[in-house]
C-alpha cells in the first residue's frame, strides 16, 4: 500500500494528489478490480497467454516500423 507523508504547510489537496498518483503507479485499483471476483486458474492462464501474444505482436509492429524508416 502506498503511503505519503504530509509535509509541513502542505495543502491537503496536494497530498491527496500525490497519494492518488502513487496508488496509480503501484497499480492498486487495477489489482482490486482484478480480485473482485474469483478467476479460475484456466482463465488466468488464458488471459496471460493472450497478453503475451498481444505484447509480442506489438513488439513486432514496432520493429517493422523501425525498419521501414531506415529505407
From Swiss-Prot:
InterPro entries: Ribosomal_bS21 (IPR001911), Ribosomal_bS21_CS (IPR018278), Ribosomal_bS21_sf (IPR038380). Keywords: Ribonucleoprotein, Ribosomal protein. It holds the Pfam family Ribosomal_S21. GO terms for molecular function: structural constituent of ribosome. The keyword tRNA processing does not apply. GO terms for cellular component: ribonucleoprotein complex; ribosome. One of its GO terms (biological process) is translation. The keyword DNA-binding does not apply. HAMAP family: Ribosomal_bS21. Belongs to the bacterial ribosomal protein bS21 family. This is Small ribosomal subunit protein bS21. It comes from Chromohalobacter salexigens (strain ATCC BAA-138 / DSM 3043 / CIP 106854 / NCIMB 13768 / 1H11).
